[in-house]
From Swiss-Prot:
Signal peptide: 1-21
Tagged with keyword rRNA processing: no
Disulfide bond residue pairs: 24-40, 33-58, 62-70, 71-76
Keyword vocabulary terms for this entry: Acetylcholine receptor inhibiting toxin, Disulfide bond, Ion channel impairing toxin, Neurotoxin, Postsynaptic neurotoxin, Secreted, Signal, Toxin
Lineage: Eukaryota, Metazoa, Chordata, Craniata, Vertebrata
Site-annotated residues for Important residue for inhibition of muscle alpha-1-beta-1-delta-epsilon (CHRNA1-CHRNB1-CHRND-CHRNE) and neuronal alpha-3-beta-2/CHRNA3-CHRNB2 nAChR: 28, 43, 51, 66
Site annotation Important residue for interaction with muscle alpha-1-beta-1-delta-epsilon (CHRNA1-CHRNB1-CHRND-CHRNE) and neuronal alpha-3-beta-2/CHRNA3-CHRNB2 nAChR: residues: 67
Name this protein carries in UniProt: Short neurotoxin SNTX14
Organism of origin: Ophiophagus hannah
Chief place where the protein resides: secreted
Family stated for the protein in its record: Belongs to the three-finger toxin family. Short-chain subfamily.
GO cellular-component term (any): extracellular region
């Protein structure tokens, strides 16, 4: 019985994802961030006049633009 429990414990530890990664919304679905990407962003930018573009996803640092949202919890940039 002890051997079975020990085996189960070892298999569980090996199968677990020991590192935490942030999950952010993209325009279509979710994105799992790289370990160094600590923030989710949602920002609107204009590449051309009167044509706003929405950008969403993981980022290394928070954008400082006027129409931007930056947060650091899972799925916070909806």
């Amino acid at each position: 019985m002890k051997t079975l429990l020990l085996t189960f414990l070892v298999v569980t530890i090996v199968c677990l994802d020991l590192g935490y990664t942030l999950i952010c919304h993209q325009l279509h679905g979710l994105q799992t961030c790289e370990p160094a990407q600590k923030f989710c962003q949602k920002r609107t930018t204009m590449f051309f006049p009167n044509h706003p573009v929405l950008l969403m996803g993981c980022t290394y640092n928070c954008p400082t633009e006027r129409y931007s949202v930056c947060c650091s919890t899972d799925k916070c940039n909806k």
